[in-house]
Amino acid sequence: MDEGYYSGNLESVLGYVSDMHTKLASITQLVIAKIETIDNDILNNDIVNFIMCRSNLNNPFISFLDTVYTIIDQEIYQNELINSLDDNKIIDCIVNKFMSFYKDNLENIVDAIITLKYIMNNPDFKTTYAEVLGSRIADIDIKQVIRENILQLSNDIRERYL
């Protein structure tokens, strides 16, 4: 960390980074242990609820998403980027992010979920797209992708952001 760009308490930041690193590693192991016991319909419903800001943190994958969202939220660029777009560009973004759900790449899926969560913070978009989003995600089976890629993604996030 370049102290020239940081004016807060370095000890506090290092503690936060260490805590988030430990939390992400722990939740990743919980996802690996529990993913097979989570019904796909419940998983998809919990993902939609997470996007709509109603998280079920008893679902370990949702806890994983919540932790990643917290870590990435420290990098406010995504929210600022979305806020700078007009409605048509946001609609294009929603459509493009949906395409990520149909690929076997967990990083793209998690990025899509988090981006959609940022977008759905806007009440107008939440009202307009909540039902469509829920029905589209309900048809997707991402458990296999989670099972195969969660450990690598967790390691990548810790490397990139922490």
From Swiss-Prot:
Show the Pfam families listed in the entry. Orthopox_A49R
Family designation: Belongs to the poxviridae A49 protein family.
Protein name listed in UniProt: Protein A49
The taxonomic lineage of its organism, from the top, reads:
Viruses, Varidnaviria, Bamfordvirae, Nucleocytoviricota, Pokkesviricetes
